Amino acid sequence: SGLSIPSNIAEGMERFSKKEKIRFLDIARASCAELITQIYIGIKAGFIEKNRGLEIKNEVEEISKILTSLIKGINNANS
């Protein structure tokens, strides 16, 4: 899911229609949620140190917020 975030952003931004752009950005945003879940699992299983995991989770949440803003901006664009 970590790799699918930038991959879906790139693919979406190459699309011509608003609908297609938004679809791929929404998939990227969903991948953020999936990655956050995997981070929590990694912390619980002892594979990720808790403080570092929470730092990464916060960064992923910020990326998700940016994607939400981008989706809203594309939705509101006049073209």
Show where each model-derived region lies.
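Short, C-terminally biased terminal segments at protein or domain edges
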Residues: 1-79
